[in-house]
Design a protein with these regions (language model features):
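Charge-rich, low-complexity intrinsically disordered linkers/tails
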Residues: 1-72, 149-174
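Nucleic-acid nuclease catalytic cores
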Residues: 60, 65-78, 82-141, 150
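Generic detector of low-complexity/intrinsically disordered segments
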Residues: 130-136, 146, 160, 169-170
Length: 174
């Protein structure tokens, strides 16, 4: 089973590198550990793959590693997006003269087999505070999702990966 997980990670890394997601100042990390507070307790969220630089996390990728599994990696991806926002907010606070991070669009990808689904999750300071105190969020959390369902659309999938790349620039704290 560990070998299968490794192959899934390797495929994801190879695909992101092939499409130039890794740049001069960014790198692909596997199994990035992040966390946030929920109900006064630390919640861990380990992303399968992330695009990071020295300070920030820009993209999270969650893979469903069990072939034929009905598990949907969407909930895990959203938790990782919240944890990435929390990490980015903490790091931004220590950078100096920057205003606090109030909201950020976190791009994400889930992979079920070789089929990607692309996400844009808007995470806010308010959502983080509500989760920390177990209060129902006072504002709507927007999660946009676009996916491919047929294997014949591989060319289109690669075009989606290319089109998705500019979100990394926007995701860098806009």
């Amino acid at each position: 089973m560990q070998e299968e997980k490794s192959a899934v990670y390797d495929f994801g890394v190879a695909l992101l590198r092939l499409l130039n997601y890794e740049g001069d100042n960014t790198m692909i990390r596997q199994r990035k550990e992040m966390s946030f507070m929920m109900g006064g307790k630390k919640v861990d969220a380990e992303a399968d793959l992330t695009i990071v630089d020295d300070n920030y996390c820009y993209l999270v990728v969650q893979e469903n590693k069990r072939i034929g599994s009905p598990d949907d990696p969407k909930a895990q991806l959203i938790a990782e997006s919240i944890a990435a926002f929390h990490l980015n907010a903490i790091r931004r606070r220590y950078e100096g003269n920057l205003p606090p991070l109030e909201r950020q669009v976190i791009p994400g990808i889930t992979m079920v087999g070789t089929s990607p689904i692309f996400y844009r999750t808007t995470v806010t300071r308010s959502l983080l505070n509500n989760l920390s105190s177990l209060q129902y969020p006072s504002e709507e959390t927007v999660v946009l999702r676009v996916g491919m369902t047929t294997v014949e659309n591989r060319r289109i999938v690669l075009q989606c990966f290319e089109a998705f790349k500019p979100l990394l620039v926007c995701g860098r704290l806009c």
